[in-house]
Amino acid sequence: MEAARALRLLLVVCGCLALPPLAEPVCPERCDCQHPQHLLCTNRGLRVVPKTSSLPSPHDVLTYSLGGNFITNITAFDFHRLGQLRRLDLQYNQIRSLHPKTFEKLSRLEELYLGNNLLQALAPGTLAPLRKLRILYANGNEISRLSRGSFEGLESLVKLRLDGNALGALPDAVFAPLGNLLYLHLESNRIRFLGKNAFAQLGKLRFLNLSANELQPSLRHAATFAPLRSLSSLILSANNLQHLGPRIFQHLPRLGLLSLRGNQLTHLAPEAFWGLEALRELRLEGNRLSQLPTALLEPLHSLEALDLSGNELSALHPATFGHLGRLRELSLRNNALSALSGDIFAASPALYRLDLDGNGWTCDCRLRGLKRWMGDWHSQGRLLTVFVQCRHPPALRGKYLDYLDDQQLQNGSCADPSPSASLTADRRRQPLPTAAGEEMTPPAGLAEELPPQPQLQQQGRFLAGVAWDGAARELVGNRSALRLSRRGPGLQQPSPSVAAAAGPAPQSLDLHKKPQRGRPTRADPALAEPTPTASPGSAPSPAGDPWQRATKHRLGTEHQERAAQSDGGAGLPPLVSDPCDFNKFILCNLTVEAVGADSASVRWAVREHRSPRPLGGARFRLLFDRFGQQPKFHRFVYLPESSDSATLRELRGDTPYLVCVEGVLGGRVCPVAPRDHCAGLVTLPEAGSRGGVDYQLLTLALLTVNALLVLLALAAWASRWLRRKLRARRKGGAPVHVRHMYSTRRPLRSMGTGVSADFSGFQSHRPRTTVCALSEADLIEFPCDRFMDSAGGGAGGSLRREDRLLQRFAD
């Protein structure tokens, strides 16, 4: 036995010694190979490329990541076994050179990342084997020169990044092999000169970034960008450009984004943007532009966003934006603007974002048109965040243009010291004749609002052939201006008497020129001019005189105000100019009159009051929305003046709504929500439609069902409990002698004594009836039937049963 055991031990030791050595690890050291197709060696502190000879199947590797290490050199054999590689990442290393045969075996490589290394050049032919390469990152290196052979063989390249290098120039046709290139990044280099053929053969290029370079101060050669017929984005920001020549971008018909921000542009040729019909975004912020040629933006019919912030613009011609019908965003922030014409944005109805902050606005009569335009747009709920803050004059410094009236804007700063302007003003103040031959001097407060009127040479009468229909005062928000219009289309021929009194018309005036007509607005009926009555000694004037009407209205208003001040306001309604006071004291009794399935009518009352003349009558804004909707009151309606009711339509049936009303004075509303003038309503269900869900009835039905389920559960539990009780009773109905058999109330000794005494004299030859005649003192009573089962066994059976009883009940 001992010899057998020794033999077995010897065999085991020999077998262990004969085993082959353990195989080397499959994954290269410090790398992660959890997925057989991805070899991850990023941020592992490597100084050389790991050997891939230990990989069982290196041809299966598709992605190889070596970024974030300290690799300085790439040899010719580092990737020669990775023939199926698709993506190679070598970013953020210290690679200074690439062996010419580094990528010789990587014919299927599609993405190569060489960014943020120390490469100084791309040797010709190094990238030639990469026929299927689509993405090449060589950004953040020290590449200072490029040659045409640097990109030879890269016909499939789509994106090329060369930003963050030290390139000083682009040789002609350097990108010619890249016929399918779509994205080219050349920003943050030192490029000073762009050759005429620098971008040759790049007909498919869509994105070109040349920002943060050192381009020459002027771009004059349109041939530089001529090959880029498909270019959609061109970024030339942060260069030293000072001048743009005419039609420099005329060969870019598909250009949609042009960025020239952060340059030193001081002058733009009027035709600088000629040919850019598809341009949608133009960025000119951060330059030194002091003016814009009137025709500069005329070709940009598709322009949607224009940024002119951070320049030195001091004035803009009213027709500067006249051809930008699709303009949506405009920034004039941080310029030197002091005034703008009210019609400068009239041709841009789609404008929804406008920035006018950071300018030195002078709030005088030159801003009346802009104030009128802003009031119109604010009344439509548009451009609500656009504000013009006054900087001059000192009395209005810090105030907003929206909250100023025309009297505050007429502060004497509009007078032009030039002789022509003073002459024009004097002519406006010359006595004007009425139709009856009277002469009247216009008031000083209204003289500047009217254009110079046509007059006869050395005469003070109206021009023959022109009939004036009086002055109609426009009151839109807080604007008031006199409008002189001609009655009927064209020119009306006067009566013979008027023509004779007027004399012949001068031949130098063109009578066929159509007058300019503004947009009609609703006039305030409460402030309409009274009809002048003719004096007994003068001829009747059907058309009236504009200055006479304006003077009468103004004098009447001033007389009422002076009378109110003299008698303490007795007999005159209160003068209200603040929208909050109007809501608090004048507006009252908002009630709901009628409610339908899709409409509702509300009515309110307005106490008697007076409004300042420049502000005009009070308008109303009705806010309504579904109850509990967030955000609140995103729907509202502006109502005309003198309105006391409104009907809301297109409501939703069987829905609660909250309706509020507030006053609008001079285009302003109270910043405090109108909580005191709100009413709730519930629209009726739609007729003919199926009734909606009655949630009360549904809740009651669900409660009833739940109660029934609870009752059923209780009934099931009660029935089960009763069954158990009945079973227990049935088991409790067993014979008395069985219950006494399992009773432990009496001691076993007395029970055994009685049994042994009674059964000690048992004899088998005695009749069996005597066996059943036991004494009443016995603990257990055995019925006679219990002893009948052994009768068939004869005497032997009785003896065996007796023996068992004696053994069981023995003392």
Swiss-Prot record:
<dbReference type="InterPro" id="IPR032675">
    <property type="entry name" value="LRR_dom_sf"/>
</dbReference>
<protein>
    <recommendedName>
        <fullName>TLR4 interactor with leucine rich repeats</fullName>
    </recommendedName>
</protein>
<dbReference type="GO" id="GO:0046696">
    <property type="term" value="C:lipopolysaccharide receptor complex"/>
</dbReference>
<feature type="repeat" description="LRR 8">
    <location>
        <begin position="230"/>
        <end position="251"/>
    </location>
</feature>
<feature type="region of interest" description="Disordered">
    <location>
        <begin position="484"/>
        <end position="549"/>
    </location>
</feature>
<dbReference type="GO" id="GO:0005615">
    <property type="term" value="C:extracellular space"/>
</dbReference>
<keyword id="KW-0812">Transmembrane</keyword>
<feature type="repeat" description="LRR 2">
    <location>
        <begin position="84"/>
        <end position="105"/>
    </location>
</feature>
<feature type="domain" description="LRRCT">
    <location>
        <begin position="359"/>
        <end position="416"/>
    </location>
</feature>
<feature type="signal peptide">
    <location>
        <begin position="1"/>
        <end position="25"/>
    </location>
</feature>
<feature type="modified residue" description="Phosphoserine">
    <location>
        <position position="798"/>
    </location>
</feature>
<feature type="repeat" description="LRR 4">
    <location>
        <begin position="132"/>
        <end position="153"/>
    </location>
</feature>
<feature type="topological domain" description="Extracellular">
    <location>
        <begin position="26"/>
        <end position="696"/>
    </location>
</feature>
<feature type="repeat" description="LRR 12">
    <location>
        <begin position="326"/>
        <end position="347"/>
    </location>
</feature>
<dbReference type="InterPro" id="IPR000483">
    <property type="entry name" value="Cys-rich_flank_reg_C"/>
</dbReference>
<feature type="transmembrane region" description="Helical">
    <location>
        <begin position="697"/>
        <end position="717"/>
    </location>
</feature>
<dbReference type="InterPro" id="IPR003591">
    <property type="entry name" value="Leu-rich_rpt_typical-subtyp"/>
</dbReference>
<feature type="compositionally biased region" description="Low complexity">
    <location>
        <begin position="492"/>
        <end position="508"/>
    </location>
</feature>
<dbReference type="GO" id="GO:0045087">
    <property type="term" value="P:innate immune response"/>
</dbReference>
<feature type="repeat" description="LRR 11">
    <location>
        <begin position="302"/>
        <end position="323"/>
    </location>
</feature>
<keyword id="KW-0433">Leucine-rich repeat</keyword>
<keyword id="KW-0391">Immunity</keyword>
<dbReference type="GO" id="GO:0006954">
    <property type="term" value="P:inflammatory response"/>
</dbReference>
<dbReference type="Pfam" id="PF13855">
    <property type="entry name" value="LRR_8"/>
</dbReference>
<feature type="repeat" description="LRR 9">
    <location>
        <begin position="254"/>
        <end position="275"/>
    </location>
</feature>
<keyword id="KW-0399">Innate immunity</keyword>
<keyword id="KW-1133">Transmembrane helix</keyword>
<dbReference type="GO" id="GO:0001530">
    <property type="term" value="F:lipopolysaccharide binding"/>
</dbReference>
<keyword id="KW-0472">Membrane</keyword>
<dbReference type="InterPro" id="IPR003961">
    <property type="entry name" value="FN3_dom"/>
</dbReference>
<dbReference type="InterPro" id="IPR050328">
    <property type="entry name" value="Dev_Immune_Receptor"/>
</dbReference>
<keyword id="KW-0732">Signal</keyword>
<feature type="repeat" description="LRR 3">
    <location>
        <begin position="108"/>
        <end position="129"/>
    </location>
</feature>
<feature type="glycosylation site" description="N-linked (GlcNAc...) asparagine">
    <location>
        <position position="209"/>
    </location>
</feature>
<feature type="compositionally biased region" description="Low complexity">
    <location>
        <begin position="530"/>
        <end position="544"/>
    </location>
</feature>
<feature type="repeat" description="LRR 7">
    <location>
        <begin position="204"/>
        <end position="223"/>
    </location>
</feature>
<feature type="repeat" description="LRR 10">
    <location>
        <begin position="278"/>
        <end position="299"/>
    </location>
</feature>
<feature type="glycosylation site" description="N-linked (GlcNAc...) asparagine">
    <location>
        <position position="589"/>
    </location>
</feature>
<keyword id="KW-0325">Glycoprotein</keyword>
<feature type="glycosylation site" description="N-linked (GlcNAc...) asparagine">
    <location>
        <position position="73"/>
    </location>
</feature>
<comment type="subunit">
    <text>Belongs to the lipopolysaccharide (LPS) receptor, a multi-protein complex containing at least CD14, MD-2 and TLR4. Interacts with TLR4; this interaction is greatly enhanced by LPS stimulation. Interacts with LPS.</text>
</comment>
<keyword id="KW-0597">Phosphoprotein</keyword>
